[in-house]
Amino acid sequence: DYFRFGGESWNQPTDGGPREPLVDKTEHEMAGYVDFRQQIVRWLTFDAGVRLDRHSHVGTEWVPQAGFSFSLPRHMVLKVSAAKGFRYPTIRELYMFRPANPDLKPERLWSYELAFSQQMQDGRLSYGVNVFYIDGGNLIMRVPVDGRPMNVNTGRIRNAGAEVQAAYRIGAAWTVDANYSYLHMEQPVLAAPEHKLYAGALFTHGRWDVSTGVQYVAGLYTEVKVAGQGEYRTENFVLWNLRASFRAAKWLSVWVRGENLLAQRYEILAGFPMPRATVMAGVNMNF
């Protein structure tokens, strides 16, 4: 695949003054990839893949991944995998506004995961447990350099955690599900929570679809220390969301959605409060 992205930005004073150019940059990204899957024996499957990414500014990046899947008795599945991930710096981070730094390098990480899942009661009940470890580096963060903010590549991160999820189909109309995740961070990461718990329900009957869920988030870092500067700030909050839709005709459905219905005050990034209770409605037409 091939991507070409970028453009020109400027400030135009409202008093009719001269236009102030900000950035005029175009980047190119080209990649090729191959995926491979082989069933070695009836109960064992091997997956592998590799992607070669070429960025016009940053250079070339190899992105491999591999894993094994074990099909066990009683509809149990065990998976083990390792994969590399990366993120190129954006044009904004490289060139735009005061924190820009054209010398940024890509963020890189390796993730290792062990996952177990099972289906029971003819598929009505399913559950899974995952444990993972992440080893990364070159995270892009904004830090003070010579008295002014600048985007820089910071040090390594080592995170480990676990996830548990379950779903149960009560009947033809009702399904409930829940999940919990725990994240241990050797070095706290911005916008990452230590604990996240969710419980939800789905009702489907005739022309109606209604879903709702409550999510509890604890220890979400809205601000972190970088190079010994700044402070650690965390948020705890509960969110309740609801969505309902009614199919009025084959080609027409009406929907309403409510988010943060408990009107919680919270932030994901320090200094940027999230909306309180929000309600939206609309129609979908299919021809």
Give, region by region, the residue ranges found by the protein language model.
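Face-selective signature of the C-terminal outer-membrane beta-barrel domain
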Residues: 1-58, 71, 125-131, 177
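Transmembrane beta-strands of outer-membrane beta-barrel pores
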Residues: 2, 9-15, 30, 50-56, ...
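Transmembrane beta-strands of outer-membrane beta-barrel proteins
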Residues: 3-7, 46-48, 64, 78-80, ...
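Residues that define the transmembrane beta-barrel architecture of outer-membrane proteins
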Residues: 26-30, 60-62, 108-112, 156-160, ...
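Residue-level signature of outer-membrane beta-barrel architecture
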Residues: 37-38, 52, 60, 70-71, ...
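Gram-negative outer-membrane beta-barrel transporters
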Residues: 39-45, 131-135, 152-223, 253-254, ...
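Outer-membrane beta-barrel signature, preferentially recognizing the C-terminal barrel domain
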Residues: 77, 81-137, 143-169, 189-195, ...
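C-terminal beta-signal and adjacent terminal beta-strands/loops
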Residues: 135-137, 216-225, 242-287
